[in-house]
UniProtKB/Swiss-Prot annotation:
Source lineage: Bacteria, Pseudomonadati, Pseudomonadota, Gammaproteobacteria, Enterobacterales
Gene: smpB
PROSITE patterns the record matches: SSRP
Pfam families given in the database record: SmpB
Compartment list: Cytoplasm
Family indicated by similarity: Belongs to the SmpB family.
Protein name: SsrA-binding protein
Amino acid sequence: MTKKKAYKPGSATIAQNKRARHEYFIEEEFEAGLALQGWEVKSLRAGKANISDSYVMFKNGEAFLFGATITPLNVASTHVVCEPMRTRKLLLNKRELDSLFGRVNREGYTVVALSMYWKNAWVKVKIGVAKGKKDNDKRDDIRDREWKLDKARIMKHANR
């Protein structure tokens, strides 16, 4: 008998929120599951997701993802109403929920979605506890990034 080959997909990442790292200081990251409908899973397999404006809100002791857009496919089911901007429940442990809820209420943090990816057959969302950056902080980050690139370029030419 032949051995079964391990399936290795190209990339597990579905969507990233690059703007979140630019606008916020990310203090801590959590991995959360996502409660989805069938048409949403099919759209995510096609890569039709956008989480650039998404954030997490708490209602009745549960966490929900707001602002994430999952565009339905043209061949989506006709008997189900496809709502792209629907709020989706995040699946977290009670301890994680309590920790996030406490930090948001007491310490003034916000919770933003950083990335959406596949983990085996499940869709996971990486969420981050974040604090907003001021304009001068953003400029400092840009300056540091540019200096890092210049330094690498200088070192490359110095070694020749």
